Regions:
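All-alpha prenyltransferase/terpene-synthase fold signal
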Residues: 1-130
Length: 130
């Protein structure tokens, strides 16, 4: 595939994964979004998908609470639990991996301002908070 096509696909995935993290980690002031809207809507996000792989009782209970009809009343507790859970570190690492793969794709382009701008854009996508 062409470097720019690969870049676009990979940075698009990274953008969505960052959005999954923002839904859990950020405040309305930071992102403009109410935290947990994807969770309440039952949207399958990367942290929840990764959480399903954990075998400990606490993780299983958290996953069950999220996937069996999460309520607005339970949301603050669930968000706090997710924010402290190792699954968030795993999800962040996966997001960084996609960003790194996007950067790797544009390394096939000639050195110069275009490549530098794409690398800067990829880094900004992965580092965004809102």
């Amino acid at each position: 595939q062409e470097p720019l096509q690969l870049f676009g696909e990979r940075i698009g995935v990274a953008f969505q994964l960052v959005d999954d993290l923002i839904d859990i980690e950020s405040t309305k002031e930071e992102s403009g979004k109410v935290a947990g809207t994807d969770l309440l809507a039952g949207v399958p996000t990367l942290p929840v998908l990764l959480l399903s792989k954990f075998e400990d009782a606490e993780s299983k209970a958290l996953y069950q609470k999220i996937t069996s009809g999460l309520t607005l009343e339970d949301l603050p507790t669930v968000l706090a639990s997710l924010r402290e859970h190792p699954v968030m570190e795993q999800a962040r690492a996966e997001t960084v991996r996609w960003g790194d793969q996007a950067i790797e794709a544009v390394m096939a382009l000639p050195a110069g301002s275009v490549r530098e701008a794409l690398v800067a854009f990829a880094n900004a996508v992965v580092d965004r908070k809102g």
